[in-house]
Amino acid sequence: MDTKNLPFLEKVMAKSGVHDIFDARDLTEVVFRVMRDLMTTEAADRVEAELHKPAETTEDRSLQLEIADLWHDTNPIVAFLSRVRPPWQGPGIFKIDSDRFLFRVENEGPMPPTVERETLVKAVFSATKDELSPDRIAEIATWLPDHIHQLWQEA
């Protein structure tokens, strides 16, 4: 299915098997949150700067967001903490490896039981890569752990 001309959230739905646009929005935000947790604030800001495009074309005000709003996080506390903490990399209990990345995606959002975690992550990655420059795509890849990096490359 060619999704190139679909709005961002509809791309996520089409490629992931998520049937509810609100779930697609919420799950995208979770994937973005975990991605941001791996990155420096400066790197996350460079990504956000390229995502100032509508997430969905709709009359529903709850969906009238830019993709950057989802990247930044609509939860003000989470958005603030993302800006003041260092990347969750390296040794320690907060390190985000591939398993923890997928665990968080599955457990921090409304993950439908019929959707595979990897399929959802690849769908969000694919829709996101459609919006980013080659420089941002390459930069994000440098922050991702092994299996998640592979999903990013495949998306």
Range-by-range predicted roles:
Residues 1-155:
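General marker for long, soluble alpha-helical cores
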